[in-house]
């Protein structure tokens, strides 16, 4: 039978691990959103430049 201290240690480690995983997952989601944002921005910029050049001809 685990003692109160052992239960507290297990609870603390479980909580710490879950917070660490949430932080890593949040960072992943943030970086994916930033990547897609910059991809869309560059494709829009390229499309606008193509439209300018085709309109000038």
UniProtKB/Swiss-Prot annotation:
UniProt GO cellular component terms: mitochondrial outer membrane; mitochondrion
Superkingdom per UniProt: Eukaryota
The entry's keywords: Membrane, Mitochondrion, Mitochondrion outer membrane, Transmembrane, Transmembrane helix
One of the protein's GO biological processes: mitochondrial cytochrome c oxidase assembly
InterPro entries cross-referenced by the UniProt entry: COX14
Location of this chain's protein in the cell: Mitochondrion outer membrane
Signal peptide: none
Transmembrane segments: 15-37
Presence of keyword Transmembrane: yes
Record topology, Mitochondrial intermembrane segments: 1-14
Membrane topology: Single-pass membrane protein
Membrane topology, Cytoplasmic segments: 38-57
Chain's role: Core component of the MITRAC (mitochondrial translation regulation assembly intermediate of cytochrome c oxidase complex) complex, that regulates cytochrome c oxidase assembly. Requires for coordination of the early steps of cytochrome c oxidase assembly with the synthesis of MT-CO1.
Complexes and interactors: Along with COA3, core component of the MITRAC (mitochondrial translation regulation assembly intermediate of cytochrome c oxidase complex) complex.
Protein name per its UniProtKB record: Cytochrome c oxidase assembly protein COX14
Organism from which the protein derives: Bos taurus
């Amino acid at each position: 039978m685990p003692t109160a201290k052992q239960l507290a240690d297990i609870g603390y480690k479980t909580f710490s691990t879950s917070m660490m995983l949430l932080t890593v997952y949040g960072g992943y989601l943030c970086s994916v959103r930033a990547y897609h944002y910059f991809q869309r921005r560059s494709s829009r910029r390229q499309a606008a430049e193509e439209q300018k050049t085709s309109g000038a001809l």
